[in-house]
Amino acid sequence: MKFRSLLSTCCSSRSLNAMENSWHDRQDNEGFRVYSYNELKSATNGFSAANKVGEGGFGSVYKGRLRDGRKIAVKVLSVEVESMRGEREFIAELTSLSNIRHENLVVLKGFHVDGCQRYLVYDYMENNSLAHALQGVGENRMRLSWQARKDILIGVARGLAYLHEEVNPHIVHRDIKASNILLDHNFMPKLADFGLAKLFGENLSHVSTRVAGTIGYLAPEYAVSGHLTRKSDVYSFGVLLLEIVSGRATVDFDMDRGEHHLVQKVWDHYNTNELVKLIDPTLDTNIREEEAVQFMKIGLLCVQENTTKRPRMSVAVSMLMRETDVKDHKISQPGHIIDFMDIKMDKGTSST
């Protein structure tokens, strides 16, 4: 494959060289390789609507099957040629993901570049996303046991802790939500969509950038000002935790009552010592209510308004594993967005 000829129309020579060198360094790394367009087109039945399994701010995702029988997921990135943001984001995602290996992270298996079009190839996750399991209707909704939910939360926390504390430079995901948690055939959770991730060195405490993420999970300081740190991910994880334990949406919209925020509801029940009332009623009867309540308290620790009081993800893992007592940490007022109109997003920023 003539790598340079495919990229020359849209990539600067500097970016092209960086991508080429990165690819050549990694092409034999655990099967990571370049796919031809015909391979991906054939695998996805011509990127048919029937094979489409997801869509977000950075593009659409299709399921496919290669000639050898292996199932894959293909993400077709949306590229804005004028701004070239697509190219930079593609390179960042490619170079970071192809070098990351953790059991709770989706692995990038390869890519294809066709002029200004970029395609990323991943392993296909048999059980779709956590959002599909929690929010599906009728037969599409899975009845996840309490043990399954615990395992999912611990897995997600471990994946985030790896990105925050073991990858150098560390990675802030920026879009932790149920639809970005994929479940394999054993329901092991895999963090997906690093197209929204930013890499920055340890000497930087934060990076101000365009807001990317989903309303309901966004940390207030990030949503309003674009002030981004690892603690922004911790907040989003806390919301996800509350969502999984309660089985409730992060934000409910009611014509009569207006916006209803899960974080505020949990905080209100915490103050009246009634957290047990928020445990998902569809959970099996074998659930230990005390344990579920402790999990919700961990969620509240993660969504505290004061970012310095939010635990690091490794500490959250320790608490979820009951290696650290939640009682050792005082829970303070949570942060939440009072008015969605306060969110300052640059033009073109997606909220999907």
Report the location of each language-model feature:
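Conserved eukaryotic protein kinase-like
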Residues: 3-352
